[in-house]
Amino acid sequence: QAKPVLVLLRPENGLQYNIEDIKKFITTRTAAIFINSPMNPTGLLLEDRFLKEIAGLGVPVISDEIYHGLVYEGRARSILEFTDQAFVLNGFSKRFAMTGLRLGYVIAPKTCMRALQKLQQNLFIIC
């Protein structure tokens, strides 16, 4: 059973994560770190420095990148630019105003694809 741990964003850090705050919560039971950038509703982009640091922690990263196509200032960087051992959640629905269609996808390490295929087969069977 998963137990999420929230790490607060602080105004004095420009609402950016402090990597030391995250490290304090990592244990041998940590299954993954979940991030999203750009963040909704602020549009805040995670800094390259943070993405590099989070990728180097040795913990799988799940990155919600659904708003990457909706950045008007700066450049949204994917966690995949810093590690190939990450899961990226993205889709077409937000970017192309197709919200009713709910078209999404995951990019994952090759070693995890078979498990994801099994999960997908059980989630999307129509009776």
Name each model feature, range by range:
Residues 1-4:
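Substrate-binding/gating loop at the entrance of the active-site cleft, primarily
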Residues 68, 72, 81, 118:
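Phosphate-coordinating loops and pocket residues in cytosolic domains that bind phosphorylated ligands
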Residues 84-127:
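Conserved core segment of the aminotransferase class I/II
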Residues 9-74:
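Active-site phosphate-binding strand-loop segment of PLP-dependent enzymes
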